[in-house]
A protein has these predicted regions:
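Membrane-embedded beta-strand positions in outer-membrane beta-barrel channels/transporters
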Residues: 1-3, 30-32, 67-69, 96, ...
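Outer-membrane beta-barrel "beta-signal"
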Residues: 99-101, 110-112, 133-147
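Generic detector of contiguous secondary-structure segments
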Residues: 22, 29, 91-100
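C-terminal structured domain segments
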Residues: 94-118
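Detector for outer-membrane/organellar transmembrane beta-barrel domains
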Residues: 5-87
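A generic beta-sheet turn/junction motif
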Residues: 7-8, 90, 101-105, 147
Length: 147
């Protein structure tokens, strides 16, 4: 396994692992970079790529994902964050917009998510979870108490 982080003008990281046995070999690798744009109070932008390869006997399954994130403080209390994740194999995108407000003893989070609908997956319905959570468009509110 490799876990490397460099904090310079641009932040860079790599997390990689190889898991090998008699019948299988799993390779996981993630590389990413981040930078704070000198706009307003600073806009943090981040990009990350992850690849997973799983070989079992003569079969191989590969998954690839890319994620982008932008985060911006709005004063001392509020923060706006956008995250977009792309499944490169299935051509799906998952998008999240979060407005958070942090106070001394609690925080409030409003999250809008836009994800593929159940019908967008090439998977039989009986293999999909029974819950609708994570499918389509959703709005979530979280109250977090910090004690």
């Amino acid at each position: 396994a490799i876990d490397y982080r460099y904090d310079g003008f641009i932040g860079f990281w790599n997390e990689s692992a190889l898991i090998s046995s008699d019948r299988s070999e799993i390779i996981m690798a993630t590389v990413g970079a981040d930078y704070t744009l000198p706009i307003a109070s600073g806009i943090l932008v981040m990009a990350e790529y992850m690849s997973i390869s799983n070989k079992i006997d003569s079969d191989e399954l590969t998954q690839s994902y890319t994620a982008l994130m932008a985060s911006m403080p709005l004063g001392m209390v509020h923060q706006l964050m956008f995250i977009s994740q792309f499944d490169l194999e299935e051509n799906h995108s998952y998008n999240y917009l979060r407005w958070s407000s942090t106070y001394d003893h609690y925080s409030l989070n409003f999250i809008l998510s836009i994800s593929p609908k159940r019908t967008d997956y090439n998977i039989p319905n009986e293999l999909l979870p029974n819950s609708l959570a994570g499918f389509g468009t959703g709005l979530q509110f979280m109250f977090i108490y910090n004690h």
